[in-house]
């Protein structure tokens, strides 16, 4: 939230930075036209997992402080548009996206709060670069830390996760007891998963290595990668 706001603030020093110019689309990358908008969204990830010092300052505080301002604006808009009357014709939720990208894998979560009781600021993937850190923060800050706060995180766009959305790749060196604790925590915080959105279906995939049985003829619907694309069997 902080980076994007600063990149659109014309009188801020970050406005003319390379990463902000890429993000706004002022510069074009040497990729095909349909990929330009995607590369804009990925511009901050292109420059690494850490916050850009050119945009956020040496300690990242510019982006964190700005994110708090934007988060408050979002909360006001959420409350303004929510129908608090008995008619309940329109419902809004306080929410944000935890936009983690690791090794070119999309590990995004939509973080949705149950009520207007929310943390002071959203936790960025720049400050918590593993899903386990997000779960721990949501549990400590919201669920266990405030009786009036409740939240869930919805994994989305897992069709771009290279399978890492469902593989506990950061837990391999942990004790069995700790792995069980994290699995239970995830089950509590992530009871849902997104199946479909504009960037394709995430429910299933034909052509996965070592799968027993014939391809599912209903599994080629709205795939990000065309069903005709040959997938190498890395089994």
Please provide the spans of the model-predicted regions:
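Extended, charged catalytic domains and RNA/DNA-binding interfaces, predominantly
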Residues: 1-235
């Amino acid at each position: 939230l902080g980076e994007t706001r600063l990149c659109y603030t014309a009188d801020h020093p970050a406005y003319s930075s390379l990463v902000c110019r890429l993000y706004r689309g002022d510069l074009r990358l040497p990729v095909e036209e349909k990929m330009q908008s995607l590369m804009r969204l990925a511009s901050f990830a292109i420059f690494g997992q850490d916050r850009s010092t050119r945009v956020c300052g040496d300690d990242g505080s510019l982006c964190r402080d700005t994110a708090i301002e934007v988060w408050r604006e979002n909360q006001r808009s959420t409350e303004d548009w929510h129908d608090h009357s008995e008619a309940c014709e329109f419902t809004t939720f306080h929410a944000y996206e935890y936009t983690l990208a690791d090794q070119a894998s999309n590990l995004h979560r939509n973080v949705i709060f149950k009520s207007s009781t929310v943390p002071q600021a959203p936790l960025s993937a720049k400050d918590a670069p593993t899903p386990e850190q997000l779960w721990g923060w949501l549990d400590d800050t919201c669920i266990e830390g405030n009786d009036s706060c409740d939240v869930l995180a919805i994994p989305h766009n897992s069709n771009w996760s290279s399978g890492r959305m469902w593989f506990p790749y950061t837990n391999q060196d942990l004790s069995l007891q700790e792995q069980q604790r994290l699995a239970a925590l995830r089950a509590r915080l992530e009871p849902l998963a997104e199946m479909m959105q504009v960037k394709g279906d995430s429910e299933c995939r034909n052509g996965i290595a070592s799968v027993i049985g014939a391809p599912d003829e209903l599994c080629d619907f709205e795939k990000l990668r065309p069903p005709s694309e040959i997938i190498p069997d890395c089994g």
